[in-house]
Design a protein with these regions (language model features):
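Residue(s) in the substrate-gating loop at a strand-loop-helix junction
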Residues: 77
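A glycine-rich helix->loop->beta "capping" turn
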Residues: 11-22, 30
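Active-site helix of classical SDR
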Residues: 57, 93
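Active-site loop immediately N-terminal to the catalytic Tyr-X3-Lys motif
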Residues: 35, 82-89
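The beta1-alpha1 cofactor-binding region of Rossmann-like NAD(H)/NADP(H)-dependent oxidoreductases
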Residues: 1-7, 39
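Substrate-binding pocket helix/loop in short-chain dehydrogenase/reductase
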Residues: 33-34, 38-43
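SDR active-site lid
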Residues: 110-189
Length: 232
């Protein structure tokens, strides 16, 4: 809703008096090959993942530039660096968010506004559970790192959520990156290794993905920050 977005900065300022940080984090996906994806599904993901980021940034940027120090934080993904099958629309949005944000980093140099592009690795969220699945007639679910080919959508979503870094830890990494003025913020060792792999072997990184994901999945800290015992 572009009109609602245009009105949002004034509502925020009326309630809080100022705005210093804008986090563009909303994201959805669809599990579908490109040839069988209905156009409305494609457009919906583009609207949420890309146009939402652009419209929110456009709406808030004039107010942020009036602050002595401010930041825009846009969430891309490791899927803004690499590509896998059945995620063409998600990749299209996340590569675009990356390009948009990195251009904005350069445009905002010399102003009071920092701009950050976030590349999360495997974070334990409900994005896979909430994803629409579109399969051609007779097509089975592809086997993946997180489950069997015959696993249900719910089982795959549960495995994805339970084996990822807890979202509270991801949030802490983002805040630390903003404080340290990092234009690129990688969340998790998997994100850092994937970035390295696609730089070293841009056409064959997919063969390295199991070696990256599986060991990290076993040792990743999945506890929420608030669940950790207090230090003595």
């Amino acid at each position: 809703d572009e009109e609602a977005i245009k009105a949002l900065p004034e509502r925020v300022i009326a309630q809080h008096g100022k705005v210093d940080l804008v986090f563009n984090n909303a994201g959805i996906t669809i599990d579908s090959d490109f040839a069988n994806m209905p156009e409305p599904d494609w457009d919906k993901v583009m609207d949420v993942n890309l146009h939402g980021v652009i419209n929110m940034t456009r709406a808030f940027l004039p107010y942020l530039k009036d602050r002595p120090e401010a930041a825009v934080v846009n969430t891309s993904s490791i899927f803004g660096m690499i590509a896998v099958p059945r995620q063409s629309v998600y990749h299209a949005t996340k590569f675009a968010v990356r390009g948009f944000t990195e251009s904005l980093v350069k445009e905002m140099k010399g102003t009071s506004v920092q701009v950050h592009c976030v590349h999360p690795g495997h974070i334990g969220t409900n994005i896979l559970t909430a994803a629409k699945v579109n399969r051609a007639e007779g097509e089975s679910a592809p086997s993946g790192l997180l489950g069997r080919a015959d696993a249900t959508h719910e089982e795959q979503g549960k495995a994805f959520r339970e084996n990822g870094m807890h979202a509270s830890r991801a949030a802490q990494v983002i805040l630390d990156g903003v404080r340290k003025r990092r234009s690129r913020i990688f969340i998790g060792m998997d994100a850092k290794l994937i970035d390295l792999a696609q730089r070293l072997t841009p056409m064959h990184y997919d063969k390295l993905l199991p070696l990256i994901f599986l060991p990290l999945m076993l040792f990743r800290n999945k506890k929420a920050i608030q669940d950790l015992p207090a230090e003595p």
